[in-house]
């Protein structure tokens, strides 16, 4: 994906960059694969904030993505590469021979007119989907299942991928970009290749207003709050924290404390923890 940079003609344009959308082939999505989606603004079903700094932004229609890739042995043809406002990756519209249309995550190198297929007989080719046990060691994959039939959960954002490094009995070992090495059942599915739009992380929004369009609200420092809002708040002028260590907004130590549950069931399937 190419990045378009702006000249500093205004303060908002200084250092600003956007995607050139050179891979996008249409601006009209498939209407039958759109559903209404109400923004929850970071609230759960009780109305409590569970994710801070969310709210507002432009309205979006949700695109129904095929994460399961369970349409076996039916060839599909790539009709379009489209922008998806709900994720960092682009999506591809697939026309199958039986007449059905589905969206999939667009991997790097996928172009209009290419043919893809799912199933154990599929070739090791970009955008084809197979069980992990049928994919050679060393292959890069994305959209990886953690439970057979549940749909892909790992490596779904722009530029992400995993590499198959070995097999152990009924398990396959993957190397994530973080350096973590988990064991995944060999019957779980994965898609060949890495997600496209890899330059997404280089985008500079330039001004706060563009972040607000995306539904991202300001992040306020704890030291700028009142003491009833944050443990760092209060004091006269620029006061120090006043505690032995930095705290989260909920009063827990913020640095140097491991946050993963020691009794989590998936701990037994992680061979090496992440390194970054």
Curated annotation (Swiss-Prot):
SMART domains: Ribosomal_L2, Ribosomal_L2_C
Keywords attached to this entry: Ribonucleoprotein, Ribosomal protein, RNA-binding, rRNA-binding
Bias (Basic residues): 252-276
GO biological process, one term: cytoplasmic translation
Region annotation (Disordered) ranges: 221-276
One Gene Ontology term, aspect cellular component: large ribosomal subunit
Cited NCBIfam families: rplB_bact
Role played: One of the primary rRNA binding proteins. Required for association of the 30S and 50S subunits to form the 70S ribosome, for tRNA binding and peptide bond formation. It has been suggested to have peptidyltransferase activity; this is somewhat controversial. Makes several contacts with the 16S rRNA in the 70S ribosome.
Family membership: Belongs to the universal ribosomal protein uL2 family.
Protein name: Large ribosomal subunit protein uL2
